[in-house]
From Swiss-Prot:
GO BP field: G protein-coupled receptor signaling pathway
Main function: Chaperone that specifically binds and folds some, but not all, nascent G alpha proteins prior to G protein heterotrimer formation, promoting their stability and activity. Also acts as a guanine nucleotide exchange factor (GEF) for G alpha proteins by stimulating exchange of bound GDP for free GTP.
Coiled coil: none
Family: Belongs to the synembryn family.
GO MF, one annotated term: guanyl-nucleotide exchange factor activity
InterPro entries from the UniProt entry: ARM-type_fold (IPR016024), Gua_nucleotide_exch_fac_Ric8 (IPR019318)
Topology term for the membrane: Single-pass membrane protein
Protein name: Synembryn-like chaperone C3E7.04c
Provenance organism: Schizosaccharomyces pombe (strain 972 / ATCC 24843)
Localization (cell): Membrane
Entry keyword set: Chaperone, Guanine-nucleotide releasing factor, Membrane, Transmembrane, Transmembrane helix
GO CC terms, sorted: cytoplasm; membrane
Membrane listed as a keyword: yes
Membrane spanning residue stretches: 492-512
Length: 530
């Protein structure tokens, strides 16, 4: 289908359309023959895959990118950039026409180079073309996410320019005269773009350490000012593109504390309960958790290589004495909520990250895992982290478990109360005695429940419950045995069988079956005498 006919079928109202999407007279006098209203409608239509496929085959994207570069300061270039980004997201194959285009270099320089001739000071006039810069950064992020390393841009230079912009925007963010919401949006896009660019470029350790500390500062600030800010998520993703080994031990501990605070702000008890019950909202909640939690858990996993940091992470992530006042399955803290996510299949990737983290903190000792988290969660941790099956949770491990009490003081497991090996909660002597002793009424009630349970299972043909003694009698095994006994035994042995484990009716029947009438008469006399 020709592009003209397809666009007319969409009702976009183009009266005339040339063979190419663009027309050039020369660089000084450009003309573009598509109305901006039509571009906006086409941009919205390209949000659908089928529309994007038709448009992708019809437009010359190399020429379109050149138009965007030449008309950069006009509104039409902004809408064309949005059209290009929408279509590239749906049809990544059009990137082949873009990655080696010189116009891509010019656009990148115009956006990121602060001292470019056409761009004034970033601090004073950034808000004038704020939307234009944000749209281009989103387009570049989509392009780098779908394209390999084969691209005309100098990624090292782009990364340096992006870091300079990040520093200045962070300085601008501290100024009360600026719109914090707009600044936050730009910071979000810069952090989003840092992840794919950092994977394609090299940075000196000194410079990388500085930008690493800056990203950590942005992360901590966003958590304190607005816990729901998207800066939090993009900062954690950006950190994964840097070498965290450049941090000192104190800085690594600080990052782990920020990570735990972030986990606490994300996890909500009510949402975890929705996931456990499988309610209608569970898919949205699962998508939210799978987008936000794995990067934070991946950062904590990468911090494990620091010497002597396991003790600090254990005190942050292991259940506290307050958590153990009830079963860990009912806990409301972020530690208990993460454990509860281990049992929910819809968020299995989160369970894999967290189980691997806990397994590393316990040095792969399955005995210690079972003793800290209980037998149920220990099995889940072993399955998610692909470790060997754990032994009895009652056995002792060599290394102590570091925890914090309600006052925030460090405790080792030897100073704590005993932990229930099943639920992971504390068990006092009173609880132990209550659990071991059952009244006669409770025993009868439990026996009755089991009786009805097996009865229902037998009626449903789930299991076949057969009395083993009755089964032996029906098979004729007892008859054969007692025939041999009566042929060889004495009266004293018959008397002993009668009073021990065999009823008188069975003995009489066996005697009749063997035709030993004199033994029957004598047996009746013995029975009467007894």
């Amino acid at each position: 289908m020709e592009l003209e006919a397809y666009i007319q079928s969409l009702g976009l109202g183009i009266e005339s359309y040339s063979q190419s999407a663009t027309q050039f007279h020369d660089e000084a006098n450009q003309s573009f023959n598509i109305p901006i209203s039509t571009i906006i409608k086409l941009k919205e239509a390209c949000r659908e895959l089928e529309t994007s496929k038709v448009v992708a085959k019809s437009l010359n994207w190399s020429h379109l990118l050149r138009v965007i570069s030449l008309l950069w300061e006009k509104d039409v270039s902004l809408e064309l950039m949005k059209l290009l980004a929408n279509c590239l997201r749906q049809v990544p194959s059009i990137s082949v026409q873009i990655v080696h285009n010189e116009s891509l270099k010019q656009l990148t320089t115009s956006v990121f180079e602060v001292r470019a001739p056409k761009v004034l000071s970033l601090i004073s006039t950034f808000n004038d073309d704020l939307e234009r810069r944000v749209v281009f950064m989103r387009f570049l992020f989509i392009l780098l996410s779908t394209q390999t390393d084969d691209i005309c841009l100098d990624m090292r230079q782009v990364r340096t320019q992006l870091i300079q912009m990040l520093k200045k925007m962070w300085t601008l963010n501290s100024s009360p005269s600026n719109n914090s919401q707009d600044n936050e949006m730009v910071l979000t896009e810069i952090l989003r773009l840092l992840f794919p660019i950092s994977k394609r470029s090299y940075l000196k350790e000194e410079d990388e350490q500085k930008i690493l500390l800056l990203v950590i500062e942005i992360w901590a600030s966003s958590l304190n000012n607005n816990p729901n800010s998207p800066l939090r998520w993009h900062a954690t993703n950006a950190l994964l593109s840097f070498n965290l080994q450049l941090l000192s031990l104190d800085q690594a501990i600080y990052v782990s504390e920020i990570a735990c605070q972030t986990l606490q702000s994300i996890l909500i008890s009510r949402e975890v309960e929705y996931l456990e019950k499988g309610l209608n909202l569970c898919f949205d909640i699962a998508a939210k958790y799978q987008n936000t939690l794995p990067p934070i858990l991946a950062i904590l996993l990468s911090l494990l290589s620091f010497f002597n940091i396991k003790q600090n992470l254990s005190m942050l992530l292991f259940p506290t004495n307050d958590d153990r006042k009830q079963s860990l399955q009912k806990g409301k803290s972020f530690r208990c909520l993460l454990l509860r996510l281990l049992t929910i299949p819809i968020v299995e990737p989160i369970g894999t990250y967290y189980a691997s983290l806990l397994n590393e903190l316990c040095d792969g000792d399955s005995q210690q895992i079972a003793r800290i988290f209980g037998a149920g969660y220990a099995m889940g941790i072993s399955q998610h982290s692909e470790t060997m099956p754990f032994p009895s949770p009652l056995s002792k491990a060599a290394s102590p478990v570091f925890q914090k009490n309600s006052r925030g003081q460090e405790n080792t497991e030897e100073n704590n109360l005993a932990i229930d090996p099943i639920t992971g909660s504390m068990c006092t002597n009173r609880n132990k005695s209550q659990r071991l002793e059952l009244s006669q009424e409770e025993k009868e009630r439990e026996a009755e429940r089991l009786f009805y349970l097996f009865q229902r299972l037998e009626k449903n043909s789930t299991i076949q419950v057969t009395n083993p003694i009755q089964q032996a009698v029906n098979s004729g095994f007892i008859d054969v045995v007692f025939c041999l006994i009566f042929q060889m035994s004495s009266e004293s042995f018959i008397y002993h069988c009668y009073h021990s484990f065999v009823g008188p009716i069975h003995i009489l029947l066996l005697m009749f079956s063997t035709f030993k009438f004199h033994e029957i008469l004598h047996f009746i006399k013995i029975s009467k005498a007894s």
